[in-house]
Amino acid sequence: MKSVAGIVLAGGMSRRFGEPKALVSWQGYTFIERIVQVMQDVMQDIVVISHASIKERVAHLIEVPVIEDISFYKGEGPLAGIVSGMEHLEAEWYMISPCDTPNISSKWIKQITGQIDDEYEAIIPIVEGRKQPLLGAYHKNVKEKIYKLLDEEKRSMEQLLSHCNVKYVTGDEWNIEKTWFVNVNTKEEYAELLTCKKK
């Protein structure tokens, strides 16, 4: 079985939300606690990439390493967070999750990691017709491609995917719940989440 480590991205500024999303409460836990718990159902090695302003608070909530972006690429978006996690944890594959999808299911993570195949460099879900690169798995060899993009001041996940051999998987063939993929960017979306019954 391939070794898989988890990387949780909590380094954003949460400007639209108005406060750190990682620390927002839902169903008795903060978003970051919930996502780490879900990942721990599937894998042992997990690291959280945190913004410096909340690193200490996040570290008190969870029992996995909490680090910041590599200094040279600090604040350069999700690519910087992913490569920082790859440098911190040694694995063949890395499962990624942002901190603002608190209803993500361990069933879904198992389905994605179950698709891992060294013929590919990334396993990316497509949900309701949209690619979800921050809820995918990446091979360790992608690390050098991320460095190259960052050095060229290219930060988008789509640019990374365009340089990778990607296996796209659709949720249509599985029994998934749409609420698993609810992404919370605003207070309005948070209010909607609070009204959703957890599946």
UniProtKB/Swiss-Prot annotation:
Record's comment describing the protein's domains: The N-terminal domain determines nucleotide recognition and specific binding, while the C-terminal domain determines the specific binding to the target protein.
Cofactor (UniProt): Mg(2+)
Binding positions (GTP): L9, A10, G11, K21, D69, D100
Reaction catalysis annotation: Mo-molybdopterin + GTP + H(+) = Mo-molybdopterin guanine dinucleotide + diphosphate
Protein name (database record): Probable molybdenum cofactor guanylyltransferase
Record bears the keyword Transmembrane helix: no
GO cellular component: cytoplasm
Listed CDD domains: MobA
Top class in the EC scheme: transferase
GO MF annotations, alphabetized: GTP binding; metal ion binding; molybdenum cofactor guanylyltransferase activity
One Pfam family, short name: NTP_transf_3
Residues passing through the membrane, by range: none
EC numbers, comma separated: 2.7.7.77
Signal sequence coordinates: none
